[in-house]
Every structure is written in C-alpha cells, then in structure tokens.
Regions:
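A residue-level marker of the well-folded mature domains of exported/periplasmic proteins
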Residues: 1-244
C-alpha cells in the first residue's frame, strides 16, 4: 500500500482498513507513506515493482506520472488498485475508485452558504494537484458562481510531514492580516488542514470564525465537541472502509 500523504488520522484509518482486509485474505502487507513528495512516491512504486510484489494499492498519486507508473506495474504482472489517483483512460485489470467529491463539497460548503444566508467572507484551505482536491475545487467553483455573496479572501494549503503545524502557521498569518469581523468562515478541503486551522483559531482567540470541512477522524470529533468549538461541520466517508 503506497499513499502520497503523511500519517494523519485519516491515513491511519485508511491503512488500518487495508491491513485488516489483507489479514483476512492471508496477505502480507507493506505500507509506505510519501508525505506528498511525488519523487518519493514514484520511488516507492518503482521499488515495489522491482521487488516483484504480487499486488499494489496506490492512493493519492498525481499527474503527470501516475498513469505511466500503473502501466509499468501492470506490464510487470502486478495486480493494481488505485484510489484517488490520477489515472488517465481505462487500463485493463486495474481497479480505479474515488469518493464522490462533488457531493462532499456540496454538503460541507453548501452548509456554510446556508448558515451565512449566502453572504460571507471566507478563507479556503486547499492545495492543487491531488485528484480529490481538484474535484472538490471544481464543485466549489460551481457553488461560488451560484452564490456571488460568498467572497474568497485567501486560498492556502500545504502537504508536508506536518500538515497541521504548517497550516496553523499559514492561518495564523492570515488572522494577523484580517482583524475580527473581516473573516466569517474557513472551508477546509481536507481535515488535516482543518485541524491546523482549528489550532490557529484557538491560539489567536479567533473562534468567532466558523470552520467547515471535508473528511473526519476521531481527533476531529473531539475538537468539534469542545466547548465553544468553531468547528461546525465535517462531511466524510469512512476511510477505513475505503482502505479495505
């Protein structure tokens, strides 16, 4: 199992699902996380091919390299399944799966629009290049056009070995730029981003800003349950089930 993200709670659940299902089937499973480092992700895949694994599960592979990597693995006689990975066209024998990111966006960002009656100044937490992020961005742009009263002030994001910490720093800088009353809400396209935003809101005393997100974890639920929590909504599918 090779995933182009770090060891956040969502990834932990995804991997746990794969390990649990693999154990039931009698498989021996190795897991590799590349923390959003495309070069490292490709190295992991090439190593798996050279080591002649029987099967490979890829998650969060990006353009322009993923299709060629998948074809290389298939040509080597390896069974391949991909999740939220940028594979172009149909490759015989390859299982391709993804979330319904348009619905996730409509439910989470759509709730923000409803809560603010179609008028709000917002910050978006997002990064380009990952297939689910691109699909969420497309759905978001459609909703923005339908709701001209929603104004995007900033769009920030970082995929690294410390997504939460890096995002908290970026959001903290934005909070310093916009005084109270200038930002109504933050919309996160990934809960790891939202965890960082939550940290920044609490540390800077800016919990008047409401937080909406996609994806869920046990940590998220704890933060949402805290007294006076600004985290209002998170919409998700079960990452453990996806991994399985």
């Amino acid at each position: 199992v090779i995933r182009n993200l770090g060891s956040d709670d969502n990834t932990t659940q995804f991997v746990a699902g794969a390990l649990q299902e693999g154990k039931k089937l009698g498989f021996k499973i190795s897991t590799f996380l590349s923390n959003g480092d495309d070069a490292k992700f490709q190295d992991f895949v090439n190593q798996a091919i050279s080591q002649k694994y029987d099967g490979i599960i890829l998650s969060q592979g990006r353009d322009p390299y993923s299709t060629a990597l998948v074809k290389k693995a298939v040509d080597a006689g390896i069974k391949v399944a991909v999740f939220d990975t940028a594979v172009s066209g149909e490759i015989p024998g390859v299982t391709v799966s993804q979330q319904d990111d348009a619905s996730l966006t409509e439910l989470s960002f759509g709730q923000l629009v409803k809560d603010f009656n179609g008028k709000a100044n917002i910050v978006k937490l997002w990064v380009a290049g990952f297939p689910p992020m691109e699909r969420r961005q497309a759905a978001y742009q459609t909703l923005l056009k339908q709701n001209p009263g929603i104004k995007e002030l900033e769009s920030i994001g970082a995929v690294s070995s410390d997504v939460q910490g890096d995002t908290a720093n970026k959001v903290g800088a934005i909070l310093a730029k916009y005084p109270k009353g200038k930002i109504d809400a933050i919309w996160g396209t990934w809960d790891a981003f939202s965890q960082g935003a939550y940290k920044a809101l609490k540390e800077n005393g800016r919990t008047e800003i409401k937080l909406y997100s996609i994806d869920i974890s046990n940590q998220d639920l704890q933060l949402m349950r805290e007294a006076g929590s600004p985290w209002k909504v998170s919409v998700a599918v079960d990452p453990k089930l996806i991994g399985a």
